Amino acid sequence: ISQVKQIYWQDALNFLTKLTPRRAWNAAKVLASFYLTRWMKRPIQWGLPLTISFEPTTACNLRCPECPSGLRAFSRPTGNLRADFFRQTMDDLHKDLLCLIFYFQGEPYINPNFLDMVRHAHERGIYTITSTNGHFLSEANARKTIESGLDRLIISVDGTTQDTYESY
């Protein structure tokens, strides 16, 4: 358990290294607007988002029974996130943005530009997180992931056997 605590502490310290004075000021504005909104009972919005989420792709190599991606049941446009759109958005927001979540329902590693996007965010000092089913984590891809600067990698295991996987 002490090793797990150490990993969490290292991750928390890494996250805090992303906090610049400008990002701290932005966070203070967002927090103040939240409390003023509650107190005044009317919406007040100061600051820019602290965290955003990008879905690198809606595609997935699995067919999880509860997932719109796995079921191919999206009611919205599908495909890969365009790298140019991503870069422009990061260039517009990076000075105030603290954290970028790189997943939703697709498998991020399917997008061929995924690790380049992670690197782009990392170079701008943004804390990056992704979740994967792990199928694309070969030794070479794992090395590229580390080199990209990804801060947190979540590997989702949705069942240890086919029966438990299919049970939900």
Task: Identify what each model region corresponds to.
Residues 155-157:
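Conserved phosphate-donor/acceptor-positioning beta-strand/loop module used by diverse small-molecule
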Residues 4-152, 163, 167:
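Conserved alpha-helical substructure of the radical SAM core
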